[in-house]
Amino acid sequence: MLDRYQAVDPAKLNLKPGARILDVGCGTGRHLLELSRYPVNLVGVDMSREDLRKTWYMFLLTANEQPVNATLELIVGGGEGLPFPDGAFDRVMCTETLEHVPDDGAVLRELLRVLKPDGILVISVPDEYSERLLWRFSERYYNTPGGHVRIYRRKQIRRLLRDNGAEPFAVEYKQSLESVRWLAHSTIDKEWGQPGRITRSLRWLLDTPSHRNWRVLAWLDALGNRALPKSIVLYGRKVRPAAR
């Protein structure tokens, strides 16, 4: 099944009932909503009040349509100076966020500070190959306010996790069809943020819920992920401090 929105694989999180899960830069709550079917405690942090309002609305809507077993708390804020004590969470997620912030190291240290020892951290950032193409084809892609401020090399993002106390144990490459959509927008559309006919068609193809079960789309996405994924997703386990 194709799901262009879900970077995180719940199976790799090994969720236990009552686990506390933090999503920093949660946006409109795509991963929080996916995890709401589990009996866990979810916390979302984002700078945008509007996005958090949309998250809460979608959470209530989801609860009316299917079983929701999670609790949800939403907090306005950024990744630096998180308002939680050390080791407050069993799992921490931060997807498509680090590439936007000036001091990614400070944010990553905060993510690991609030994560319990042996807890799992999930990070996703744009993959270097698709990102380099987008930067080359369109200056608008990286010059838009609030846009991406860096390109991560694959080895670099792994090293960033290790240097800050998390040992990667799994990596996935995802959402190659999103690379196609962004390339179309960057090279064909005249107005940035105003998708043209081709880009609108691609968005319709990828966004329509009934299309998620189209095997051909899932096959094309999986094939494309070998060459031009949009995102790299890393799972790391927080290293326990050495015993003294």
Language model features: what each stretch is:
Residues M1-P85, R91-T95, G105-L108, T199-L205, ...:
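Conserved N-terminal segment of class I S-adenosyl-L-methionine
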Residues K155-E172:
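A SAM-dependent methyltransferase catalytic signature shared across enzymes that methylate proteins
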